Amino acid sequence: MFVLKGYEYFLGFLLACSLVPILSLTASKVLRPSGGGPERRTTYESGMEPIGGAWIQFNIRYYMFALVFVVFDVETVFLYPWAVAFNQLGLLAFVEALIFIAILVVALVYAWRKGALEWS
């Protein structure tokens, strides 16, 4: 059938992964309610009439805190499987984890010295 033997499942998976979003977006476009007045375009604020504008500018410092949080959150995601399998991994994995933690500590010290964690 196929010239490339063994790739049938991969091609089927690729086709399914391509069709699911396309079909989902098409179905939502076809099934959504259309029309509506100007009330539909207003910001929903807990069922109350919105007061003021909908565009709020956040301080750039929030983004720095969020970025540092994401970095250390990803660290937790990487270290959790290592901690679960700690007994089976051995000394090499322990040294690799220490190097990983050391790099992140250096990054934290760098961010601290550059003032990324200062609010004022």
Swiss-Prot record:
EC id: 7.1.1.-
Gene Ontology MF terms: NADH dehydrogenase (ubiquinone) activity; quinone binding
Topology term for the membrane: Multi-pass membrane protein
Source organism superkingdom: Bacteria
Record field: transmembrane: 7-27, 64-84, 89-109
Top EC class of this enzyme: translocase
Heme as UniProt keyword: no
GO cellular component: NADH dehydrogenase complex; plasma membrane-derived thylakoid membrane
Catalyzed reactions per annotation: a plastoquinone + NADH + (n+1) H(+)(in) = a plastoquinol + NAD(+) + n H(+)(out); a plastoquinone + NADPH + (n+1) H(+)(in) = a plastoquinol + NADP(+) + n H(+)(out)
Keyword list, A-Z: Membrane, NAD, NADP, Plastoquinone, Quinone, Thylakoid, Translocase, Transmembrane, Transmembrane helix, Transport
HAMAP family xrefs: NDH1_NuoA
Protein family: Belongs to the complex I subunit 3 family.
Subunit and partners: NDH-1 can be composed of about 15 different subunits; different subcomplexes with different compositions have been identified which probably have different functions.
The name this protein goes by in its record: NAD(P)H-quinone oxidoreductase subunit 3
